[in-house]
Curated annotation (Swiss-Prot):
Positions bound to ATP: 7-14
GO molecular function, one term: ATP binding
Keyword tags: ATP-binding, Kinase, Nucleotide biosynthesis, Nucleotide-binding, Transferase
Its EC number(s): 2.7.4.9
Domain of life: Bacteria
Protein name, per record: Thymidylate kinase
Entry-linked NCBIfam families: DTMP_kinase (TIGR00041)
Amino acid sequence: MFISFEGCEGTGKTTHSSYLFEKLSKKYSCVLTKEPGGGLFNEVIRNILLHSYNKQIDFHTEALLFAADRAEHLSKLIIPALQQNKIVICDRYLDSTIAYQVYARGLSKDFVLNINNLALNYMPNITFYLDLDPKIGIQRVKQFRPKEINSFDLQKLSFHKKVRKGYLDLYQKDQQKRIFLIDASKSLEKIYNIIEQKLKEVFQIDL
């Protein structure tokens, strides 16, 4: 089973994916990972993409780096884990690329999907999209992880609004009902309960 967490900056993706991993690991064989990142090679790419000098990288180059990271991530970690019937929990996946590179950066959707062709064959069974006003999200970032601010955190509010629009469009056009929207302004406990209830309801996962 493949579970992903999506959302703009400061929505709690890392917090909730980590908590779910902790809960599920008590009863199931699980893997917690993230994008970009997830392996030695992936961490090198992550450092390039999230460093402040990323502002100088061409948007197509940036998208290709994300695609390279995902291809390596899939082949070395996600696919093997799924083949071993493990539950994979991923902090960001392909939806992030569409929201950020297509909606916010303005790249062609066809270009982005073509370079991420492998990922289209391994889409999550369920995606928890944590929705929040970008202004509040950035405030959270500055408050709770001031020493970990990356190149995307530094973008203008207008950029983050485009990202959110991208996510909302993906949610509204999701015919497979893969994406489950959660109001990220709710308390951590309420969000945990919503996630647990959805997994029990749809996949009969006992937490």
